Amino acid sequence: MADFVNASIFGTLFQITSRYVNLEPVGMGAFGLVCSAKDQLTSSPVAIKKIMKPFSTPVLSKRTYRELKLLKHIRHENIISLSDIFISPSEDIYFVTELLGTDLHRLLTARPLEKQFIQYFLYQILRGLKYVHSAGVVHRDLKPSNILVNENCDLKICDFGLARIQDPQMTGYVSTRYYRAPEIMLTWQKYDVAVDIWSTGCIFAEMLEGKPLFPGKDHVNQFSIITELLGTPPDDVIQTICSENTLRFVQSLPKKPRIPFNEKFKTNDPLALDLVEKMLSFDPRTRITASQALAHPYLAPYHDPNDEPVAAEQFDWSFNDADLPIDTWKVMMYSEILDFHHISQDGDQFLNANGPGTEQASDSSFTV
């Protein structure tokens, strides 16, 4: 069995292979703890994300499986890449990815961003989204803390745990409130890749202003703040609301006029204002796409249609509609991990995490 080393991080057991050393906490979210470490095989810094109790519920099992499937298949310069994955003897799952020094949230709280950085960061976000959306995938939880940046200003989108195949009947209350598209709040269904463009528009506005554009205290307040800028939703948008209660609520609100963006924003850059306005269209059907946004004049310094690739094929995530028991998700997860390491499921030998040679791994300790 592979050699595992125990460490306590914020009172949480980190049980990793001896391939990784020098663990330091980076951040903690609702579904996992992230540490930085050194990969002794490559001498490179990495990020190790522990998925806590991935098999505690079918919902969490599916979420973890979904994120693994995405990270395995998405290969793009502006999307975080998976370099290793293993399951510890205690059946926690660890994703190992490249380490970037900071995230956009930390940058925005530290200092105002200059125009060239705003342009470059926005360009990279949209470049990544063009690829993801071309595969029929919606991220669903874009926010500054999910946008990683290194010292060279290279940017990568991370945290695909909530991502889904584009589905005209997609449901659920998902993204962080400040960056949540109005169609999610209004209908909870019938939304698509346009929700990511809204979130990116909110991030773009935050880079321009230095603070969140729509800092709602709850979903009602969030919607109210949005209408203070964009005005009352058009009638054809209101008519798409499926919930009768939500429809009555929206129709009961006083009519609000739209505020010109040049009165709301500090920037006097007309190209920036034009692009953010196109990204924050109330109607997702008229919202600009990632591909269209990349070609906008505001991003002309970086736009290169020959270097903005799309996915070779759509992802087949038919499992997303499956209601499976935990044990089935576990078997599927093990299969994906074996496939990631290019090892036949029929074999009992697995590469040692510490270098050349093979060792037999237990059912709960897959690694390389």
Swiss-Prot record:
Mitogen-activated protein kinase involved in a signal transduction pathway that is activated by changes in the osmolarity of the extracellular environment. Controls osmotic regulation of transcription of target genes. The modification Phosphotyrosine is found at Y173. One of its GO terms (cellular component) is cytoplasm. SMART domains: S_TKc. A motif (TXY) lies at residues 171-173. The modification Phosphothreonine is found at T171. It comes from the Eukaryota. Its main location: cytoplasm. ATP binds at V26, G27, M28, G29, A30, F31, G32, L33, V34, K49. Phosphorylated. Dually phosphorylated on Thr-171 and Tyr-173, which activates the enzyme. Rapidly dephosphorylated upon either hypo- or hyperosmotic shock. The gene is HOG1B. One of its GO terms (biological process) is stress-activated MAPK cascade. It is an enzyme of class 2 (transferase). InterPro entries: Kinase-like_dom_sf (IPR011009), MAP_kinase (IPR050117), MAP_kinase_CS (IPR003527), MAPK_p38-like (IPR008352), MAPK_Sty1/Hog1 (IPR038783), Prot_kinase_dom (IPR000719), Protein_kinase_ATP_BS (IPR017441), Ser/Thr_kinase_AS (IPR008271). The active site is at D141 (proton acceptor). Its cofactor is Mg(2+). Its EC number is 2.7.11.24. It catalyses: L-seryl-[protein] + ATP = O-phospho-L-seryl-[protein] + ADP + H(+); L-threonyl-[protein] + ATP = O-phospho-L-threonyl-[protein] + ADP + H(+). The TXY motif contains the threonine and tyrosine residues whose phosphorylation activates the MAP kinases. This is Mitogen-activated protein kinase HOG1B.
